[in-house]
């Protein structure tokens, strides 16, 4: 379970945004909402140990995220977190399957090709497993990013504007796949978004509070 209690995070030396009370059980999703530039991405980076936390607390299970040293943050990020970035960071010349398999390589773990193939199958991309990422549509590439985020069976998945630039059908498909993948994996899911369409799903919503 992810728990956040009045977290104030920033970029550099100064606080940027406050996130109040957040709880997300395994398989549960929370929308972190606010206008563009309101610090949502910074809040995600702080949960990942990549942006400074100025005050407040956050726990993943019984691990106090605010008490970890840099090495501990790196280990936890590699072993227990998955990410779906707005810029998907797929390697254009690699296949969909090989892009999914980058996750364990980055974490220093052995690749799990059978699980990667099963994930691609579960999101409807089994037939495109060997297609280069540069030949995938935006929606297909987004699915590959979701599969990559789930490969290591993370306890926490952080998604930054996962439906940006998608039409209504692709938005619905992407969100449904992301929610289902989190449930199947048992991962708490935090989605930073200013896409009003996501609110229609009745998910838990937390507003960010800009500090400036």
Region annotations inferred by a language model:
Residues 48:
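Helix-to-loop junction immediately C-terminal to a conserved catalytic motif
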Residues 56-64:
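Conserved ABC transporter NBD signature motif
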Residues 64, 111-128:
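Conserved ABC ATPase "signature" region
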Residues 65-82:
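ABC ATPase NBD coupling module
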Residues 132-136, 140-142:
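Conserved ABC ATPase signature
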Residues 153:
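Conserved catalytic motifs of ABC-family nucleotide-binding domains
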Residues 157-160:
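Catalytic Walker B motif of ABC-type/P-loop ATPase nucleotide-binding domains
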